[in-house]
Amino acid sequence: MAQEGRSYGGLTREERDAQRRQRLLETAKEIIGTQGYAATTIPGVCAASKVSTRHFYEIYPGKEDLFVDLYDRITADSYARVATSLTATAGEPISERVPAAVLAYLDPMLKDPRVARIAFVEIMGASPRIEKLRLDYRETLVEIVGTECAASVGRGEILDRDWRFAALALVGAVTAIVYDWALHQPRSSREALETQLADLALVLLTADPPA
């Protein structure tokens, strides 16, 4: 007699659901990242994932929930990279810490244009719930930048200013630049873009404000 919960291929229901979830997420990344959220349908995602609609609804209540899960995972990955970068550059001046953290945050987007589209374009205004999630994550990023800059002021490295304004300017500029880069072929090398983004971060956050 088969062990309870291990009816198929020696996997528990939880393990099978985890595999289905992963396939749904990979398919969602492909479809949303190339065709857009509005063009994404549950039947289309299920067909491409080889997951029945019944199993889909056992995992996600709807399309929005799939998108939220995908965006959460993308953003959590980026924030984990930021934390690792800030730990690795502890004790370094802001001129080293902030550019490294910005590039760490952007690494998944620079590796995969689909991720850039999801994180920087499709997420905007997709629904009230998704928009709130985007703004909450943006607020966290603004707070991280502000904390780093305030600490740098305390060390006498830079002059104080409105860090929320500067952080929002950086986030907005980076969002537009990276997505534009991902859209176009031919494009500059990733290395060239990283240099430009690091320089931009330094100008916005460390240059002395006008007298």
State each model region's role.
Residues 23, 31-65, 69:
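Helix-turn-helix
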Residues 76, 80, 128-154, 164-168, ...:
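Amphipathic alpha-helical packing segments from all-alpha helical-bundle domains
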